[in-house]
Amino acid sequence: MKKTDNPSTNSSANSSKVMKTKSHPFWQWFWLTFLVVSLAYAWYSFYVPSNDVVWADNMVSAQELADDSGKNMLLFFTGEWCVPCRIMKREVFADKEVMKAINSQVVPVMINIDDPYAEELVKHYKIGTTPITIFTDPQGKVLDYAVGKIGKTKFLKMLENLGATGS
């Protein structure tokens, strides 16, 4: 006599085999490593160290301070969503040499282009992308600028050139 298989019994036996199957250790380590690396990258992307640059609150107070001190202004146009801006804040503005140079030579203003109060400045300086670094005289006349992410060396060179030609 031939034994017939009952499909309902067979499928439950197969499903219990599937449930008991463990994944290969390689994949466990792969996914764990992937998760750790992803978390580290996410933290690094959003981490901006504190710095000692004394950023002006607004353009009016910055112009008054620049006028009184005889310094030029640094306008840094940024956005909350701007990854190159965060990299500049972390790698350029948090550098001790850069902080010292900024605080001694210019009046810095950080301008978030998404802020409704910055709309007039964004239009005036024709800002279409970020980051943009602009050096101006106290009246707001552009002396030098850079579009996009710049490194410490280029930033310091711009500041040096500004000192040689500026007031």
Question: Where do the protein language model's features map onto the residues?
Answer:
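Active-site-proximal beta-strand/loop segments in catalytic clefts of secreted hydrolases
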Residues: 77-79, 111-114, 138, 148-149
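Hydrophobic beta-strand anchors of alpha/beta hydrolase catalytic cores
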Residues: 74-75, 108, 133
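Short pre-active-site segment immediately N-terminal to redox-active cysteine/selenocysteine motifs
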Residues: 70-73, 77-81, 129
